[in-house]
Amino acid sequence: MIKLGIVMDPIASINIKKDSSFAMLLEAQRRGYELHYMEMADLYLINGEARARTRTLSVEQNYDKWYDFTGEQDLALDSLDAILMRKDPPFDTEFIYATYILERAEEKGTLIVNKPQSLRDCNEKLFTAWFSDLTPETLVTRNKAQLKAFWQKHSDIILKPLDGMGGASIFRVKEGDPNLGVIAETLTEHGTRYCMAQNYLPAIVDGDKRVLVVDGEPVPYCLARIPQGGETRGNLAAGGRGEPRPLTDSDWAIARRIGPTLKAKGLIFVGLDIIGDRLTEINVTSPTCIREIEAEFPISITGMLMDAIEARLQK
């Protein structure tokens, strides 16, 4: 029996209709895995050994009672076969410390999804720089004058922090907008933090597509998140409407180009964000949209993921 751990935000407060971590737990349970639930505060390191308080867990598709803790124990993390790191951003120093704890278990043979070092190495915004021919024109800077010059060149740009999620603090600055200065000062905290600028992509009106990649293999369907009511952002957390779709030829090309790098880095479950034919983000911390896609198309993304985990465990 496979012993699967999961590190996540409190399960009591999730929305099971759209929670991808919950979908993973349902599939793992269906396969007979022993489930061990952890929150960040449960992880600890003692004399170099990674340990945790874990609670054994059962889950069910029931909107009134979707989980039950069936036991509690303190154990060495390397006694688990695999651990899903599904804590949502912010990707802060606490998150980084947790990856070091998980890495100690990884060194003793536990499979961590996604690989702790790669979670640290691959910032969701900056990692796109390694595939710059696939992205919009992109500037990463703290410098207000550089941001202004970029805006003057493109006349319609998107500004965003490097550590946000769900569309938080994303600004569109059009030609003639008097607010560029204050937005730049806010995002860079007066020149002390980096932010990202990209030229605005009109294709956003047709959706910001979330393309999932499982151990290097693209999932053939994506979720297009379409901005509503004059909003620039398609993120579901920002009120976007989700529309599952098959991948386009350009989606396939982008995902197949990046897939081998993701697989080599131990990034087993990743969400690419694509607008039109341009890559905008590579989400590695806790990508979502499984449930929306599975509800519309005859595919088990969680099945693909568990197959990939089992294949890696057999190596």
Curated annotation (Swiss-Prot):
Residues 125-310 form the ATP-grasp domain. Its EC number is 6.3.2.3. Glycosylation at Arg-256 by NleB enhances the glutathione synthetase activity, leading to an increase in glutathione production. Glycosylation may promote C.rodentium survival in oxidative stress conditions. One of its GO terms (cellular component) is cytoplasm. Pfam families: GSH-S_ATP, GSH-S_N. InterPro entries: ATP-grasp (IPR011761), ATP_grasp_subdomain_1 (IPR013815), Glut_synth_pro (IPR006284), GSHS_ATP-bd (IPR004218), GSHS_N (IPR004215), PreATP-grasp_dom_sf (IPR016185). Binds 1 magnesium or manganese ion per subunit. Mg(2+) binds at residues 281, 283. PROSITE patterns: ATP_GRASP (PS50975). Pathway: Sulfur metabolism; glutathione biosynthesis; glutathione from L-cysteine and L-glutamate: step 2/2. Belongs to the prokaryotic GSH synthase family. PANTHER family: GLUTATHIONE SYNTHETASE (PTHR21621:SF4), RIBOSOMAL PROTEIN S6 MODIFICATION PROTEIN (PTHR21621). This is Glutathione synthetase. The gene is gshB.
